[in-house]
Protein backbone atom coordinates (compact mmCIF):
# COMPACT_ATOMS: atom_id res chain seq x y z
CA UNK A 1 0.00 0.00 0.00
CA UNK A 2 1.54 3.30 -1.09
CA UNK A 3 1.67 6.37 1.12
CA UNK A 4 -0.68 9.03 -0.22
CA UNK A 5 1.12 12.03 -1.65
CA UNK A 6 -0.06 15.55 -0.80
CA UNK A 7 -2.62 16.90 -3.27
CA UNK A 8 -0.49 19.98 -3.85
CA UNK A 9 2.86 21.43 -2.83
CA UNK A 10 1.39 24.20 -0.64
CA UNK A 11 1.14 21.78 2.26
CA UNK A 12 4.84 20.95 1.89
CA UNK A 13 6.32 24.43 1.91
CA UNK A 14 7.32 24.29 5.60
CA UNK A 15 8.26 20.61 5.69
CA UNK A 16 11.54 19.43 7.17
CA UNK A 17 13.47 16.58 5.58
CA UNK A 18 11.88 14.12 8.01
CA UNK A 19 8.52 14.75 6.33
CA UNK A 20 9.91 13.61 2.98
CA UNK A 21 11.69 10.49 4.17
CA UNK A 22 8.66 8.10 4.29
CA UNK A 23 7.93 8.66 0.60
CA UNK A 24 11.47 7.81 -0.41
CA UNK A 25 11.54 4.84 1.97
CA UNK A 26 8.39 3.49 0.32
CA UNK A 27 9.92 3.79 -3.15
CA UNK A 28 13.20 2.24 -2.05
CA UNK A 29 11.63 -0.67 -0.14
CA UNK A 30 9.11 -1.73 -2.78
CA UNK A 31 10.14 -4.78 -4.82
CA UNK A 32 9.87 -3.88 -8.49
CA UNK A 33 8.13 -6.13 -10.98
CA UNK A 34 6.80 -5.83 -14.50
CA UNK A 35 3.33 -5.31 -13.06
CA UNK A 36 4.15 -2.39 -10.74
CA UNK A 37 7.06 -0.57 -12.40
CA UNK A 38 4.80 1.89 -14.24
CA UNK A 39 2.93 2.78 -11.05
CA UNK A 40 6.22 3.04 -9.13
CA UNK A 41 7.64 5.41 -11.75
CA UNK A 42 4.52 7.57 -11.69
CA UNK A 43 4.62 7.83 -7.90
CA UNK A 44 8.28 8.84 -8.05
CA UNK A 45 7.55 11.33 -10.83
CA UNK A 46 4.64 12.88 -8.90
CA UNK A 47 6.78 13.17 -5.77
CA UNK A 48 9.57 14.82 -7.76
CA UNK A 49 7.10 17.26 -9.29
CA UNK A 50 5.79 18.29 -5.88
CA UNK A 51 9.31 18.80 -4.54
CA UNK A 52 10.18 20.78 -7.66
CA UNK A 53 7.19 23.05 -7.05
CA UNK A 54 8.35 23.72 -3.50
CA UNK A 55 11.84 24.54 -4.75
CA UNK A 56 10.48 26.82 -7.47
CA UNK A 57 8.31 28.65 -4.94
CA UNK A 58 11.15 29.42 -2.54
CA UNK A 59 13.40 30.39 -5.45
CA UNK A 60 10.86 32.80 -6.94
CA UNK A 61 10.51 34.50 -3.55
CA UNK A 62 14.19 35.45 -3.74
CA UNK A 63 13.74 37.00 -7.19
CA UNK A 64 10.69 39.11 -6.30
CA UNK A 65 12.79 41.02 -3.76
CA UNK A 66 16.53 40.29 -3.84
CA UNK A 67 16.95 42.06 -0.48
CA UNK A 68 14.44 39.81 1.34
CA UNK A 69 16.59 38.04 3.95
CA UNK A 70 13.76 35.75 5.06
CA UNK A 71 13.23 34.53 1.50
CA UNK A 72 16.96 34.03 1.17
CA UNK A 73 17.06 31.98 4.38
CA UNK A 74 14.15 29.79 3.21
CA UNK A 75 15.89 29.19 -0.10
CA UNK A 76 19.17 28.26 1.60
CA UNK A 77 17.33 25.93 3.97
CA UNK A 78 15.66 24.19 1.04
CA UNK A 79 18.99 23.76 -0.74
CA UNK A 80 20.81 22.43 2.32
CA UNK A 81 18.15 20.33 4.04
CA UNK A 82 15.88 19.21 1.21
CA UNK A 83 17.59 19.43 -2.17
CA UNK A 84 20.82 17.71 -1.14
CA UNK A 85 18.96 14.84 0.55
CA UNK A 86 16.57 14.50 -2.37
CA UNK A 87 19.49 14.20 -4.79
CA UNK A 88 21.10 11.52 -2.65
CA UNK A 89 17.90 9.48 -2.33
CA UNK A 90 17.08 9.91 -6.02
CA UNK A 91 20.47 8.44 -6.88
CA UNK A 92 19.57 5.28 -4.96
CA UNK A 93 16.21 5.07 -6.71
CA UNK A 94 17.81 5.48 -10.13
CA UNK A 95 20.24 2.67 -9.39
CA UNK A 96 17.39 0.51 -8.09
CA UNK A 97 15.42 1.09 -11.27
CA UNK A 98 18.36 0.48 -13.62
CA UNK A 99 19.37 -2.71 -11.83
CA UNK A 100 15.80 -4.03 -11.99
CA UNK A 101 15.99 -4.35 -15.76
CA UNK A 102 12.41 -3.15 -16.10
CA UNK A 103 11.51 -0.19 -18.28
CA UNK A 104 8.19 1.40 -19.27
CA UNK A 105 7.30 1.60 -22.95
CA UNK A 106 8.84 4.45 -24.97
CA UNK A 107 11.36 5.13 -22.20
CA UNK A 108 14.56 4.95 -24.27
CA UNK A 109 15.45 8.65 -24.15
CA UNK A 110 14.66 9.16 -20.43
CA UNK A 111 16.57 5.94 -19.72
CA UNK A 112 19.64 7.31 -21.48
CA UNK A 113 19.38 10.46 -19.39
CA UNK A 114 19.01 8.51 -16.16
CA UNK A 115 22.11 6.44 -16.89
CA UNK A 116 24.00 9.67 -17.49
CA UNK A 117 22.79 11.14 -14.18
CA UNK A 118 23.88 8.05 -12.26
CA UNK A 119 27.35 8.19 -13.80
CA UNK A 120 27.65 11.91 -13.11
CA UNK A 121 26.59 11.74 -9.47
CA UNK A 122 29.08 12.33 -6.67
CA UNK A 123 28.11 12.67 -3.01
CA UNK A 124 30.97 15.14 -2.60
CA UNK A 125 29.30 17.46 -5.09
CA UNK A 126 26.07 17.94 -3.16
CA UNK A 127 27.36 20.73 -0.88
CA UNK A 128 29.32 22.19 -3.80
CA UNK A 129 26.20 22.40 -5.96
CA UNK A 130 24.45 24.10 -3.06
CA UNK A 131 27.33 26.56 -2.79
CA UNK A 132 27.16 27.20 -6.54
CA UNK A 133 23.44 28.00 -6.29
CA UNK A 134 24.01 30.33 -3.33
CA UNK A 135 26.77 32.19 -5.15
CA UNK A 136 24.50 32.65 -8.16
CA UNK A 137 21.90 34.22 -5.88
CA UNK A 138 24.57 36.53 -4.43
CA UNK A 139 25.18 37.73 -7.97
CA UNK A 140 21.43 38.21 -8.50
CA UNK A 141 21.23 40.24 -5.30
CA UNK A 142 24.01 42.56 -6.47
CA UNK A 143 22.40 43.07 -9.88
CA UNK A 144 18.97 43.55 -8.33
CA UNK A 145 20.24 46.27 -6.00
CA UNK A 146 21.75 48.38 -8.80
CA UNK A 147 19.72 51.58 -8.92
CA UNK A 148 20.28 55.17 -10.08
CA UNK A 149 18.50 58.51 -9.64
CA UNK A 150 16.69 59.43 -12.83
CA UNK A 151 14.42 62.46 -13.15
CA UNK A 152 14.01 62.65 -9.39
CA UNK A 153 13.23 58.97 -8.86
CA UNK A 154 15.30 55.98 -7.82
CA UNK A 155 14.98 53.37 -10.57
CA UNK A 156 16.58 50.02 -11.34
CA UNK A 157 18.74 49.69 -14.43
CA UNK A 158 15.98 47.64 -16.03
CA UNK A 159 13.51 50.45 -15.39
CA UNK A 160 16.00 52.84 -16.99
CA UNK A 161 16.29 50.83 -20.21
CA UNK A 162 13.17 52.32 -21.95
CA UNK A 163 15.10 55.59 -22.21
CA UNK A 164 17.20 53.84 -24.88
CA UNK A 165 14.10 53.78 -27.10
CA UNK A 166 13.50 57.53 -26.98
CA UNK A 167 14.62 59.94 -29.70
CA UNK A 168 16.47 62.36 -27.37
CA UNK A 169 20.06 61.27 -28.02
CA UNK A 170 21.59 63.32 -25.20
CA UNK A 171 19.22 61.73 -22.74
CA UNK A 172 20.03 58.27 -24.08
CA UNK A 173 23.74 58.91 -23.68
CA UNK A 174 23.25 60.22 -20.16
CA UNK A 175 21.18 57.18 -19.17
CA UNK A 176 23.59 54.70 -20.76
CA UNK A 177 26.65 56.21 -19.06
CA UNK A 178 24.82 56.41 -15.75
CA UNK A 179 23.94 52.70 -15.96
CA UNK A 180 27.46 51.74 -17.03
CA UNK A 181 28.98 53.70 -14.14
CA UNK A 182 26.63 52.02 -11.67
CA UNK A 183 27.51 48.56 -12.99
CA UNK A 184 31.22 49.27 -12.68
CA UNK A 185 30.78 50.11 -9.00
CA UNK A 186 30.09 46.41 -8.39
CA UNK A 187 32.90 45.15 -10.59
CA UNK A 188 35.08 43.94 -7.73
CA UNK A 189 32.23 42.23 -5.88
CA UNK A 190 31.08 40.44 -9.03
CA UNK A 191 34.63 39.37 -9.87
CA UNK A 192 35.07 37.94 -6.37
CA UNK A 193 31.86 35.92 -6.75
CA UNK A 194 32.95 34.70 -10.17
CA UNK A 195 36.30 33.47 -8.81
CA UNK A 196 34.47 31.54 -6.08
CA UNK A 197 32.07 30.06 -8.65
CA UNK A 198 34.97 29.08 -10.91
CA UNK A 199 36.80 27.27 -8.11
CA UNK A 200 33.59 25.55 -7.00
CA UNK A 201 32.79 24.36 -10.51
CA UNK A 202 36.30 23.08 -11.10
CA UNK A 203 35.94 20.99 -7.94
CA UNK A 204 32.54 19.70 -9.09
CA UNK A 205 34.03 18.51 -12.37
CA UNK A 206 37.02 16.90 -10.65
CA UNK A 207 34.85 15.01 -8.15
CA UNK A 208 32.91 13.44 -11.03
CA UNK A 209 36.05 12.49 -12.92
CA UNK A 210 35.97 15.24 -15.55
CA UNK A 211 38.95 17.28 -16.66
CA UNK A 212 37.04 20.54 -16.88
CA UNK A 213 33.68 22.04 -15.96
CA UNK A 214 32.52 22.33 -19.56
CA UNK A 215 32.80 18.57 -20.03
CA UNK A 216 30.88 17.99 -16.79
CA UNK A 217 28.23 20.56 -17.70
CA UNK A 218 27.85 19.06 -21.14
CA UNK A 219 26.94 15.72 -19.62
CA UNK A 220 24.78 17.38 -16.95
CA UNK A 221 22.72 19.11 -19.66
CA UNK A 222 22.44 15.80 -21.54
CA UNK A 223 23.83 17.18 -24.78
CA UNK A 224 24.11 13.75 -26.35
CA UNK A 225 23.46 14.69 -29.97
CA UNK A 226 26.22 17.23 -30.57
CA UNK A 227 29.71 17.92 -29.25
CA UNK A 228 31.64 20.98 -28.07
CA UNK A 229 33.53 20.87 -31.37
CA UNK A 230 30.21 21.04 -33.22
CA UNK A 231 29.48 24.26 -31.30
CA UNK A 232 32.86 25.71 -32.20
CA UNK A 233 32.19 24.89 -35.85
CA UNK A 234 28.86 26.70 -35.52
CA UNK A 235 30.61 29.67 -33.90
CA UNK A 236 33.04 29.88 -36.81
CA UNK A 237 30.11 29.80 -39.23
CA UNK A 238 28.48 32.69 -37.37
CA UNK A 239 31.72 34.65 -37.49
CA UNK A 240 32.00 34.04 -41.23
CA UNK A 241 28.37 34.60 -42.27
CA UNK A 242 26.43 36.44 -39.58
CA UNK A 243 29.00 38.92 -38.23
CA UNK A 244 29.47 40.65 -41.62
CA UNK A 245 25.68 40.87 -41.93
CA UNK A 246 25.43 42.36 -38.43
CA UNK A 247 28.12 44.89 -39.34
CA UNK A 248 26.11 45.85 -42.42
CA UNK A 249 22.95 46.31 -40.36
CA UNK A 250 24.83 48.56 -37.92
CA UNK A 251 26.20 50.59 -40.82
CA UNK A 252 22.69 50.98 -42.22
CA UNK A 253 21.47 52.10 -38.78
CA UNK A 254 24.23 54.70 -38.51
CA UNK A 255 23.37 56.11 -41.94
CA UNK A 256 19.61 56.10 -41.26
CA UNK A 257 20.16 58.03 -38.03
CA UNK A 258 22.51 60.45 -39.81
CA UNK A 259 25.35 59.80 -37.37
CA UNK A 260 29.08 60.08 -37.90
CA UNK A 261 29.69 57.45 -35.22
CA UNK A 262 27.25 54.87 -33.88
CA UNK A 263 27.33 54.60 -30.08
CA UNK A 264 25.92 51.96 -27.69
CA UNK A 265 23.02 54.28 -26.82
CA UNK A 266 22.00 54.38 -30.51
CA UNK A 267 21.21 50.68 -30.89
CA UNK A 268 17.58 50.58 -29.76
CA UNK A 269 16.05 53.86 -30.93
CA UNK A 270 13.75 53.76 -33.95
CA UNK A 271 15.77 54.58 -37.09
CA UNK A 272 12.88 56.60 -38.54
CA UNK A 273 12.78 58.96 -35.57
CA UNK A 274 9.50 57.66 -34.17
CA UNK A 275 8.90 57.75 -30.44
CA UNK A 276 8.45 54.34 -28.76
CA UNK A 277 4.97 52.88 -28.42
CA UNK A 278 3.29 53.14 -25.02
CA UNK A 279 0.59 50.45 -25.01
CA UNK A 280 -0.17 50.90 -21.29
CA UNK A 281 1.17 52.60 -18.18
CA UNK A 282 0.22 50.13 -15.46
CA UNK A 283 -1.43 46.76 -14.86
CA UNK A 284 -4.82 48.34 -14.18
CA UNK A 285 -4.86 50.07 -17.55
Protein language model features and the residues they cover:
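A well-structured
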Residues: 1-281
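Amphipathic alpha-helical domain-onset/packing element
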Residues: 283-285
